[in-house]
């Protein structure tokens, strides 16, 4: 069944038409190189902004720093700005905000957790990634949510290879998250990415192994699980963008863009010094 209609990206659908498979792009070697560049620049923005995610900083200030870096330093384009009317260059989702939080004058405080979501367009291709940042020291139960979500992302990444199915990704993430007594948001999902910001296929973060589209070398898509400390239900605020947990529980998200290769997959948005969890 189809979940409620929401925006940015398209709502997750478990019943996508089979015809969607015909629309999934297989990147040429030249396009793969362009995707690597866009991914590298996206990771660079997140590396840059990390030290600025501190108590007293406003999310609008973070947006301005990222915008200027992308436009002035990278000679690139912040994809979210103006996308379907979105008013800022990044998304900043604090505490119980699940995704698509709009930067504003809200100032961060000690103990907050913040997801910063960055998408860069360079030479016509997109890179998309998000990271969690903790403002100062957070309680152990909060750190655990952040860590489990990161591990869940990598559980999904590790099953990506030619011949694997989209359902394998969702099943790996869902079983790990629920095994750690958290819940997976179902209304939003990963997506194909390339010349378009949001392309086919949709990459659900829940599902059944062995189902869904078979992966092929040359596909590029995001994996971006949103994990709630409480129940999985979310609601959309009147601004039309900000998604929050219905029960006001904390939520965390991590995202990478991946390329399916003959040998498995390549993560295009790795941060400086980032090492996959054991």
PLM region descriptions:
Residues 1-278:
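Active-site neighborhoods and metal-handling regions in enzymes and metal-associated proteins
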């Amino acid at each position: 069944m189809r979940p409620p209609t929401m925006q940015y990206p398209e709502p997750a659908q478990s019943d996508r038409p089979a015809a969607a498979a015909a629309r999934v792009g297989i990147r040429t070697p030249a396009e793969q190189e362009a995707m690597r560049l866009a991914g590298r620049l996206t990771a660079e923005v997140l590396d840059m902004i990390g030290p600025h995610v501190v108590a007293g900083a406003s999310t609008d200030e973070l947006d301005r720093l990222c915008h200027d870096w992308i436009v002035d330093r990278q000679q690139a384009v912040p994809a979210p700005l103006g996308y379907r009317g979105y008013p800022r260059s990044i998304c900043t989702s604090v505490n119980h905000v699940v995704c698509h939080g709009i930067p504003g004058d809200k100032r961060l405080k000690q103990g907050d957790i913040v997801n910063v979501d960055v998408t860069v367009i360079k030479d016509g291709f997109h890179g998309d990634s998000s990271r969690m940042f903790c403002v100062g020291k957070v309680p152990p139960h909060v750190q655990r949510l952040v860590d489990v979500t990161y591990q869940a992302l990598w559980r999904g990444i590790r099953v990506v290879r030619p011949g694997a199915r989209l359902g394998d990704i969702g099943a790996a993430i869902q079983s790990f998250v629920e095994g750690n007594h958290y819940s997976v948001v179902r209304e939003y999902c990963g997506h194909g990415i390339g010349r378009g910001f949001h392309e086919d296929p949709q990459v659900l973060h829940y599902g059944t192994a062995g189902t869904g589209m078979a992966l092929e070398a040359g596909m590029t898509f995001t994996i971006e699980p949103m994990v709630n400390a409480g129940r999985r239900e979310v609601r959309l605020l009147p601004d039309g963008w900000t998604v929050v947990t219905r029960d006001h529980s904390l939520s965390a998200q991590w995202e990478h863009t991946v390329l399916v290769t003959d040998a498995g997959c390549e993560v295009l948005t790795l941060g400086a010094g980032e090492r996959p969890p054991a």
